[in-house]
Regions:
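Ser/Thr/Asn(+Pro)-rich, low-complexity disordered segments
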Residues: 51-500
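Mature N-terminal, pre-catalytic/accessory segment of carbohydrate-active enzymes
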Residues: 41-53
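Sec-dependent signal peptide hydrophobic core
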Residues: 27-28
Length: 500
């Protein structure tokens, strides 16, 4: 198992304190790290920080761009969901099954749409109800046609029937992302009317049904997947990666909580290293530095590992963001267009699988793959994913905003669609060959033709967290998230004053 296994599974299975007055306000946002920090370690152990956070006026400088990206990304989830069951396609416009992780991001997007005025609270309430009612159907045994078992769901479902797609696995991380969205809705929809009360009840039932203990095939770790045909797969969730949110929810469960030793086991495989001037926990694709932060505000709170390092996980993601930008500026492999405003490697689509000669140099390219760059691993074929940079907006707005603007200027309509940023582009790949996805634009390279739900999700959520902290503030009030963080040993900041 391990972080590498996480990347492999994701690729193969599917293929600072901010202040705001609410949506639409035009005010100066001082994006700085939270003041509440653990004491710094001794000078000899003190890691080199990323450049100090800059004062960035999000609304005055980039309000229209953020509005445009946020609204179009919201429309991916709102317009493409199946109105009968709430399922959201894994990708579009290519024909697609549903991704349960994308459904979790959709559940997170709907309240954002309410606060931004895209839809009414009643419209969002009804959409969430449709979705949660579908998932709350009995899912006790892995029967043919079922969506899940033991409170967990299959990675991909048929968009129309909701049945398991082909032979995909019951997925712990994808169920986790779905449950995170459900718990966000549970806390957000807090009014006494019958519909909102039902949302709270359904989310409660779904979360309580998740049998985390059954997944401890190699205790105290949690397995990544299981199928009735082959049983548990070979990988467990070991850090550092997107599995943080999984263990927070597994530890916070009121019915089937894993022991606190699970967090210690998860963090035992952490790798702290230096990469392009930054010292931080290594994980190559940026999605692993985003996903848990969509729902959990890690500013100013730390577990035992981070207390020893003298930072928090928010700062860690900030450093990972700067390191990836540093890698793109250095551009050791000579990919076209890489630079201070064109950067960002993550799991995403790509042009083709195979080796090709480009301008006299042999190059290897991938289709969907967990791209990334770190001291631990570099997997890079010249393909940039907009979600990689945009998902880091709360961490490093001073470098993310120029990247967003550059992607708009440089790529224009070739990278931006009705539903926001297309998934990826590769300026180096300019060959006229048959492609699975996307197209080659002469003089500009390859551009994807699809948006992917699990890449659109962090875009809308992290833009909103940077602008208003909506998801963070809401989830600070969720008792299960609070309990999970405390059982993992987190202290400090907002967590110390959260209700017990």
């Amino acid at each position: 198992g391990g972080a590498g296994g996480a990347s492999a599974l994701r690729a193969s299975g599917r293929r600072r304190e901010v202040s705001a007055r609410g949506p639409g306000s035009s005010l100066l946002l001082l994006l700085v790290l939270a003041a509440c920090r653990p004491a710094s370690p001794p000078a000899a152990a003190r890691p080199a920080p990323a450049p100090p956070p800059a004062v960035v006026s999000l609304e005055e400088r980039a309000g229209p761009l953020l509005d445009l990206v946020e609204k179009r990304t919201f429309d991916y989830f709102w317009e493409l969901a199946n109105l009968k069951n709430g399922l959201v396609p894994d990708r579009s416009p290519s024909p697609s099954f549903s991704s349960i992780a994308a459904v979790g991001f959709a559940l997170t997007a709907y309240p954002i749409g309410v606060e931004r005025g895209y839809v009414t609270r009643q419209q969002a309430r009804d959409r969430v109800l449709t979705t949660l009612r579908f998932f709350a159907r009995p899912a006790g045994a892995p029967e043919p046609g079922a969506a899940g078992a033991r409170g967990f769901f299959y990675h991909f479902l048929d968009m129309e029937t909701g049945a398991r797609f082909e032979k995909v696995e019951l997925s712990t991380i994808d169920t986790t992302l779905f449950l995170a969205g459900a718990l966000f809705c549970q806390t957000y929809f807090d009014r006494p009317d019958a519909g909102e009360a039902e949302i709270r009840d359904l989310a409660e039932r779904l979360y309580r049904a998740a049998d985390w203990l059954w997944w401890q095939h190699h205790p105290p770790l949690v397995s990544m997947g299981w199928t009735s045909e082959e049983g548990f797969n070979e990988w467990d969730w070991r850090g550092y990666n997107e599995g943080m949110i999984l263990y927070v929810l597994a530890l916070g469960s009121p019915t089937h909580p894993v022991p606190a030793s699970a967090w210690e086991a998860y963090t035992r495989t952490y790798e702290w290293n230096r990469f392009y001037g930054q010292e931080y926990l290594q994980f190559a694709p940026l999605f692993g530095h985003h996903y848990s932060h969509v729902w959990v505000d890690f500013r100013g709170i730390s577990d035992r590992y981070m207390r020893a390092r003298g930072i928090d996980y928010f700062e860690n993601s900030r450093r990972a963001t700067y390191a990836q930008r540093g890698y793109a500026v250095a551009n050791p492999n000579g990919w076209k267009a890489y630079g201070e405003n064109v950067w960002g490697l993550s799991a995403c689509d790509g042009p083709i699988d195979g080796d090709f000669e480009i301008e006299g140099r042999k190059r290897h390219f991938f289709t969907y793959a967990a791209r990334g760059a770190s001291a631990k691993e570099v997997r890079d074929d010249g393909t940039i994913a907009p979600t990689a940079a945009v998902g880091s907006l709360p961490f490093a707005p001073e470098i993310v905003l120029p990247a967003m603007e550059e992607m708009q200027r440089w790529a224009g309509g070739r990278l931006f669609s009705r539903y926001g940023f297309l998934d990826a582009f590769n300026p180096t790949f300019a060959l006229s060959v048959s492609l699975k996805h996307g197209k080659v634009v002469p003089g500009a390279g390859w551009f994807d033709s699809d948006c992917l739900g699990i890449d659109q999700g962090p875009i809308i959520a992290m833009i909103e967290n940077a602008r208003s902290e909506l998801v963070w503030k809401t989830m600070r009030r969720n008792p299960y998230v609070v309990a999970g963080l405390r059982r993992a040993g987190f202290t400090g900041g907002w967590l110390d004053s959260a209700p017990r």
